[in-house]
Regions:
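An N-terminal, well-structured beta->alpha segment
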Residues: 1-63
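Glycine-rich phosphate/pyrophosphate-binding beta-alpha loops
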Residues: 141, 248-281, 361-365
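Gly/Pro-rich interdomain helix-loop hinge
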Residues: 272-350
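Short, amphipathic C-terminal "tail helix"
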Residues: 347-384
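N-terminal small/polar loop signature for handling phosphorylated ligands or for N-terminal nucleophile
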Residues: 41-114, 229-240
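Glycine/threonine-rich beta-strand-loop-alpha-helix active-site module
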Residues: 73-178
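Carboxylate- and glycine-rich phosphate/diphosphate-binding segment that chelates Mg2+/Mn2+
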Residues: 51, 149-257, 374
Length: 384
C-alpha cells in the first residue's frame, strides 16, 4: 500500500507570500509566532513577511534563536516562546533549520507527553496534529515545508535525530522565489545539491512507486536545467523559480517513500562537526551512487542520466550507470562543492564512530543496497 501526505494548501510563484495573510485570516487565527533565524532578520528577508502581517493587521512575535543544525535547546526555547506569546499559529520562515524547529515546537505543544525531544526520534506515535504552521522556505533544497520529517541535533550525544510524523506537516506551504534571491552562491549550490540528493535517493529507494518516480524524475530535470544558472546569477528569476519548484517536487516524493545512506552518512557530519546538511549530502552523493549501482536500483540509473540531460538512446545499463554518476559529479564540481571529506574538517580518527552512527540512522533502511558498518566506514574512507 502506498501513501501520499501533502500540505492542505500550497502557493507557488514570485510574490505569492501575500497569500499568507488571507490564509491566516480565513482560518480564524489571531496571532502568529514567526519562527526564523537571525541572518534572515539581518538581511531583511524576515521584514518581507513582517510587512505582509502588518498590512493585514495580524499581530505577531518573533523567535529567532535557531542554529543551522537546530538543537534540542532551540526547540525547547522556542516552545517556551510560543507559549509565552499567546500565538495560535506559526509562520516558519527559512531553510530546514527554521521549519524543522517550528515542526518540533508544534508537535510538542500539542502532544506534551513528548516534551523530551529525544522521544520523538524515529516514527513518533503522536496523537494530535501540530500547531498550525505556514511554512515559507528561503532556500531551494530541504523541502521541509512539504515533508513529514524533521531533524533535531542532540548536542550532548553528538547525534542528529530524524523524526517522522505525518502530524507535523505544515498546513500551508508558500514557495516564493523572491525570498530566495539573496541566497549566496555557496548556499544556493549546497541546498540545490541537497534537493538533487532527495530526488535521486527517493527515485532508487525500494519504496519508490509510479507517483514518486514522476515527482523525482521531474525534480532531477529541473535541477539539471536551473541549478548552475541560479548559482552563477542569483537574480535570475527563471533559475530561482525552477529550483524552488524542483526542491518542492522532490519533497513531495521523498517525504512519502524515504531516503538512503547519503542522508544516513550526512547526519553524523552535522552532529559531529556542525557541517551544513546540504554540503554533506552534496559531497557524499556521487560516492554513494557508485556504491548503490550494485543493487536492484541499477537499471534506474538510465533514468537519472536522462533526467540529467544525457542522451541515453541505445545506452546499456552499465553505460547509464557511468553517465548518471558522471553527470552528478560534473554538476557538483561546476558549482564548487567540496569533493573530499578532508576538505570540510572531518577527522580520519572519527570515521568508525561516524559509520556506527550512520548505520543506526533511520534513513539506512531505505537504501536500495543492504549495508553494514564496515561498508559505510569504507565509503567514508573513499570520500575522505
Amino acid at each position: 500500500m502506498n501513501r501520499i501526505v501533502l500540505n492542505e494548501t500550497s502557493y507557488y510563484g514570485a510574490g505569492c507570500r501575500v497569500a499568507i495573510a488571507d490564509e491566516i485570516k480565513k482560518r480564524g487565527f489571531k496571532k502568529v509566532l514567526l519562527v526564523t533565524d537571525k541572518p534572515l532578520i539581518q538581511f531583511g528577508v524576515a521584514a518581507k513577511i513582517e510587512e505582509v502581517l502588518k498590512n493585514a493587521d495580524i499581530p505577531y512575535e518573533i523567535y529567532s534563536e535557531i542554529k543551522p543544525n537546530p538543537t534540542i535547546k532551540n526547540v525547547l526555547d522556542g516552545l517556551a516562546a510560543f507559549k509565552a506569546s499567546g500565538a495560535d499559529c506559526m509562520v516558519a520562515l527559512g531553510g530546514g533549520s527554521s521549519i524543522d524547529t517550528a515542526k518540533a515546537i508544534g508537535i510538542i505543544n500539542n502532544n506534551p507527553e513528548f516534551t523530551d525531544v529525544r522521544s520523538l526520534e524515529g516514527v513518533a506515535p503522536t496523537k494530535n496534529k501540530a500547531v498550525p504552521t505556514f511554512a515559507v522556505p528561503t532556500t531551494a533544497g530541504t523541502a521541509a515545508e512539504v515533508t513529514i520529517n524533521y531533524v533535531i541535533t542532540d548536542e550532548e550525544n553528538r547525534k542528529k535525530m530524524v523524526c517522522v510524523d505525518p502530524n507535523d506537516i505544515p498546513i500551508c506551504a508558500v514557495i516564493d522565489c523572491e525570498l530566495m534571491m539573496s541566497m549566496p552562491k555557496g548556499l544556493t549550490a549546497s541546498t540545490g545539491l541537497d534537493a538533487l540528493t532527495h530526488a535521486i535517493e527517493s527515485y532508487i529507494t525500494p519504496g519508490a512507486w509510479t507517483m514518486s518516480d514522476m515527482f523525482e524524475f521531474k525534480a532531477i530535470q529541473l535541477i539539471h536545467e536551473h541549478l548552475y544558472n541560479a548559482v552563477q546569477d542569483g537574480n535570475d528569476v527563471k533559475a530561482r523559480e525552477g529550483m524552488a519548484e524542483a526542491q518542492y517536487i522532490a519533497g513531495m516524493g521523498f517525504s512519502n517513500v524515504g531516503l538512503g545512506i547519503v542522508h544516513s552518512m550526512a547526519h553524523p557530519l552535522g552532529a559531529f562537526y556542525d557541517t551544513p546538511h546540504g554540503v554533506a549530502n552534496a559531497l557524499l552523493l556521487p560516492y554513494v551512487m557508485e556504491y548503490n549501482a550494485d543493487s536492484p536500483a541499477r537499471a534506474k540509473y538510465l533514468g537519472i542520466a536522462k533526467a540529467m540531460g544525457v542522451n541515453t538512446d541505445g545506452m546499456s545499463v552499465d553505460e547509464g550507470v557511468a553517465a548518471a554518476i558522471k553527470a552528478v559529479r560534473d554538476l557538483s564540481i561546476s558549482v564548487n562543492i567540496p569533493q573530499h571529506l578532508s576538505e570540510i574538517g572531518v577527522k580520519k580518527e572519527d570515521l568508525h564512530d561516524l559509520a556506527v552512527a550512520a548505520f543506526n540512522d533511520v534513513c539506512t533502511g531505505g537504501n536500495p543496497r543492504p549495508t553494514s558498518v564496515e561498508d559505510i566506514e569504507k565509503l567514508y574512507n573513499i570520500a575522505f
